[in-house]
Amino acid sequence: MTEQKKINLLDLNREGMRELFASFGEKPFRSDQVMKWIYHFGVDNFDDMSNVNKKLKEKLKAECEIVAPEISVRQQAKDGTIKYALVLEGGQEVEAVWIPEKERATLCVSSQVGCALECTFCSTAQQGFNRNLKVSEIIGQVWRVAKDIGLDGHSEKRPVTNVVMMGMGEPLLNVKNVVPAMELMLDDWGFGLSKRRVTLSTSGVVPALDLLKEKIDVALAISLHAPDNALRDILVPVNKKYPIEEFLAACRRYIDGSKANKDVTVEYVMLNGINDSTDQAHALVQTLKGTPCKVNLIPFNPFPGNEYTRSSNSRIDRFSKVLQAAGITCIVRRPRGDDIDAACGQLAGDVVDRTKRLAKKKMRDDNAIAVNIHQA
């Protein structure tokens, strides 16, 4: 007879926790007490929950567990940024990045093992795709890193003040698990972050963005990276299915009903000679007309096997000035953690690729070499 798998409490939002505790014959406040121990004090041992009665502790120990991904590698950059490799059930790894600043500490978390969207300038996309992360594996990144930095429930300084869903994967291809995880980030019995301090970034899965609007209100960022469909089709292939005009219309629908968003943050990676000319800056101004937004220009962060190069500071400056002259708030993002491959677009993890993307690429490359040799 196989042993029944225990319920991981990190997989449950407040509603799920209260339903579970009701099935134990317990009142909602008992569920809230346990959530406070987990998320405010970083406790994962039921015996350490001093205001939980012995009978309930025994029930919890018999049927439940609190299990987050484990840290396998912790790398600290010169600027204080820390990149974590976190081991999942089954042995695969995802990466999360903690970015300290004077008044806040932002954690970039992953939503999938790998990514299926194949954006050409992103290291994660080159790893292929394996699976969606569970709720416990998403919120568990926040829990594990906060605990590593110093989550104890006593310090006034929070180890994590902001969370951005900008790590490995496309969050809107995992709405089922991303939404409950973000609910735990926002919940007062969870991490208690404000709506404006939790940001979801998407490459443009339009139907899922409309679905998100009905489920949760958080800050929205979009991976645009091109001023027109012709170029974006190449850089961000999901654009072939959901072109820019449809994507931006969905963004407007989302922020129209949002209290967390007055505008959308547009992310634009600066690729030398690809998308960084002043003509393209003017085209971007036209594309963004009618969409309340601010633009983050992101200097490209190189990774092995990629042929793109970073735009020069002068090209980025000229591009930025065109946007600013048109009245668009524009920020050039300073690379953080690039000396440990923790910057935007550099996260890779350890992915068993179910899409066989790497194998197919190698086969194409090998075939191209064979053709060249034959023609020589």
Curated annotation (Swiss-Prot):
It comes from the Bacteria. Disulfide bonds join C108-C344. Its main location: cytoplasm. S-adenosyl-L-methionine binds at G169, E170, S201, S223, L224, H225, N301. It is an enzyme of class 2 (transferase). GO terms for biological process: rRNA base methylation; tRNA methylation. Specifically methylates position 2 of adenine 2503 in 23S rRNA and position 2 of adenine 37 in tRNAs. m2A2503 modification seems to play a crucial role in the proofreading step occurring at the peptidyl transferase center and thus would serve to optimize ribosomal fidelity. This is Dual-specificity RNA methyltransferase RlmN. It comes from Pseudoalteromonas translucida (strain TAC 125). The gene is rlmN.
